[in-house]
């Protein structure tokens, strides 16, 4: 999850998973994994900031885990976001409004990561029922990490996995699930790619709508409609035609 970085070096999803892992051995394991991933995949300054925020989150988990307040639904996400902000606010003050917007989005992702991770790691059914989209958010994190690998000519093999996930959701599930899932996956790809555009979100959502409405239940037609919708959306936007066709 440390590889699923946004805005040039933030790793909020890894920090959220540290918080979701709680105190004790599981929390230590998450901290070690996130720290190792940060050192391997992030710029050095961001790796240090991620490590510092992770240590603060783990320490706060150990300090508060036996309190009633800790069991409240909103406490852990706010705790993780607060610990991350306590490290990042110095850099926000230095870099100005643009960095503040990036940091705010990273804090939101950290809180969502903590909420989804706790639901996924929970042993009780109630937590999973309250957060039915938690597995989707973790899947999104993995897809963002996979799509961060790019070849010299811009080809990212991980984006094929994201498009396959959108196609499967559109084919197997109803529009109430498939379209929000496609939009979230597209937003994750846009955040990971940087640049401030929402091309992936728009094209994935459009393709999910088209497949779900016109060809759901027919594998060949679903694949053809999906490919056509991606081509119609991407090629007029000066996308690299060879890469689009390869995807």
Where are the language model's segments positioned?
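Membrane-embedded alpha-helical hairpins and interfacial helices in multi-pass inner-membrane proteins
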Residues: 1-180, 184-247
């Amino acid at each position: 999850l440390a590889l699923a970085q946004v805005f040039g070096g933030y790793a909020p999803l890894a920090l959220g998973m540290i918080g979701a892992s709680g105190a004790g051995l599981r929390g230590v394991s998450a901290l070690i994994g996130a720290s190792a991933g940060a050192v391997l995949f992030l710029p050095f300054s961001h790796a240090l900031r991620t490590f510092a925020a992770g240590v603060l989150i783990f320490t706060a988990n150990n300090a508060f885990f036996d309190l009633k307040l800790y069991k409240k639904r909103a406490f852990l996400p706010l705790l993780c976001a607060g610990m991350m902000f306590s490290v990042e606010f110095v850099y926000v003050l230095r870099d100005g409004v643009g960095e503040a917007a990036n940091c705010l989005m990273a804090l939101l992702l950290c809180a969502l990561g903590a909420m989804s991770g706790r639901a996924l790691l929970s042993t009780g059914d109630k937590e999973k029922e309250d957060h039915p989209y938690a597995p989707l958010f973790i899947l999104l994190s993995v897809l963002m990490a996979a799509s961060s690998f790019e070849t010299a000519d811009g080809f990212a093999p991980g984006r094929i996995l994201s498009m396959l996930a959108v196609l499967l959701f559109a084919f197997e599930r109803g529009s109430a699930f498939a379209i929000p899932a496609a939009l979230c996956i597209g937003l994750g790809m846009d955040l990971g790619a940087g640049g401030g555009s929402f091309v992936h979100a728009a094209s994935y959502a459009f393709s999910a709508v088209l497949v779900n409405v016109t060809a759901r239940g027919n594998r060949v037609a679903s694949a053809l409609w999906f490919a056509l919708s991606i081509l119609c959306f991407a090629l007029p936007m000066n996308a690299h035609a060879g890469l689009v066709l390869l995807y």
